[in-house]
Amino acid sequence: MIHPSIDLLGGKAVQLRGGNPDDCVVAIDDVQGVAAQFARHGELAIIDLDAALGRGDNLALIASLCAQFDARVGGGIRSHERADTLLRMGAKKLIIGTCATPDFLSRYPADRLIVALDAKGGEVVDHGWTRGTGAQVLDRAQQLSAYCSEFLYTPVDREGLMGGTDLEAIARLVAATDNRVVAAGGITSLPEVVALDRMGASCQLGMAIYTGALSLTDCVMAMLDWGKSDGLLPVVVQDSNEQVVMHAWVDREALAFTLATGNGHYFSRSRERHWRKGETSGHTQRVLAVRYDCDRDTLLYRIEQTGRACHIPTQYSCFGDQTFNLRTLEAALQSRRAEALAADTEDAGSYTRRLFTEPGLVEAKLKEEVGELIDAATPREIVWEAADVLFFTLTKLARHGLTLAQVEKELHGRHGRRRAPASSQGDA
């Protein structure tokens, strides 16, 4: 797997030579644009260098990025308060370095934690790579393997120098742990990317992709198994409601177009040509992420669909009707809100328009429906009233320009947040 790195310093995406903040090789102002492009290729790795160096933070920017993209976040996480804050912002996982102790890590689910093994000459260093710990990499990995799901290994003396990474050291770490290993620092060539993938390690790429020495698209292409279907790969296409909407095929060129443009491109086996979804129908696909399976021979496109995905006029998906769920309802409410607020709406007194424009109406309905849910006694009554509460909750979110995805990220953050130490939990 590939994790494009976004290192933040002073609100910019930067790359430092040797981790030295006074030797900045790359500085990009448009962090959001970089993130959108990178996110199509893999889950982002966001590193707050200011926090790591103890000279401020980039929390507002990180919150914005985590609201839009899947990301793991690290840099300066030296307190439970900061860890909790990042999880609530939507970080999928936390990268912990300086505070990677059993006591600190045990407060969180292991599947939400990555331990940073930053090494100089085999010794683990912390505090922004400025302090030696006396611990060796393999010893630290053995000590902490039960408290995390991944290790992020960086030979810091190779970081940003474009001189290649330490494949032998990474192979030793992969062999020594059952945890997933992500390699960073000095990766500069496609053979290295492929070698790491073959040994079971992922790549966190920084300097090489910012300077153009490596292309993220080339990296993805190189890891895939193109030999099973005459140079083609099957693609499962999934919309923002997580409904599978179609199955298609790509060759290298179609995949490259997709990754470069963010539009769904495919290869037609019957017509023997490339095609872009929506080129005649207007029912386009915005590709948010391209992911590949464990065998590297099947792709998943996560998309935002405009109109129908299927060529049959009566079907939304090539597999049938659009699935109804809370996101479907949310989309309908957002559409109704836009219509209700249009200046030329004909039905100014409609109930829908009132819900989105009349102060206090949604809040009053929520209070009423919550009370009825509390009083509901039979299974049927409980389901009925719960549906009303959900409807008006989604209406309130839509009225304020908020989404169900934001609520889900909040719940996901709470799920991964700190647990009380065992000694303080008391008897249940």
Predicted regions and their residues:
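Hydrophobic faces of well-ordered beta-strands that scaffold small-molecule active sites
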Residues: 2-8, 44-47, 71-75, 94-96, ...
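Short catalytic helix/loop segments, enriched in acidic residues and glycine
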Residues: 19-38
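C-terminal helical cap(s) of enzyme catalytic domains, especially alpha/beta-barrels
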Residues: 102-115, 193-222
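Conserved anion-binding
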Residues: 8-23, 84-159
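Charged helix-capping and loop-helix junction motifs
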Residues: 56-63, 130-139, 163-172
